[in-house]
C-alpha cells in the first residue's frame, strides 16, 4: 500500500507498520469477496503476517493458496538475504504448509531453488517466460509469469529473467505483469483469451491496491 518505490527496508519496522495503517487487514475481506469462488494464490509478505496473523488463516479458510513473497519487501538477489528471509518467516511457512514462492519484483537468482527446496517449497514463480512454460530446477519447479513471444520463442530459462529492456527488446510482451495490464488492459484481456483457446494457462499477478481500495 505504501511502497511505490517497490522497497521500504530503509524504514524502521515501526514506521512501516504505521504507514500501512492496517490497510492490509481491512482489505483482505473485500478482496476475498471479489474473487468469490475463483481460486487464486496470495503471496504474502512475512512482516505483514507478523502484524496481522489472521491473514493467512482467512485466505486458507476461503479455499485459496497461501504463498510466500518475502519477509521484508525489497530486491532479493543475494543468496544470503534470501536465506535470512526464509528463516525469518519459517514459522508461518511451516504452519500453513506454504509450497509456492514469488520473488519481489519477479527478480531472483538460480541459487534460490536449492534454498526453496530445503524449506519444502514445490515451485517458484519468479521469472518471466511464455505461457505454458514450466522448468524443473532440481526439486523445485519454476512456473513463470506469462509473456507473449512476438519473435522467436526462447529456449533457455535461467534466473534472473525479469521485466527489463533485454526481455522486451528480445520480443517478449510481459502481459502477466500488473504494470502491463494496467497500461494495456484490453490488449492483455485479448491475449489471455487467445492463450486459453490455445490450451495454455496464463500466469498473471495483481497487487491488492489494484483490486480494492480500503476505506
Short names for language-model regions:
Residues 173-174, 178-186:
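Double-stranded beta-helix
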Residues 167-172:
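Active-site-proximal loop/helix segment associated with metal-binding centers of metalloenzymes
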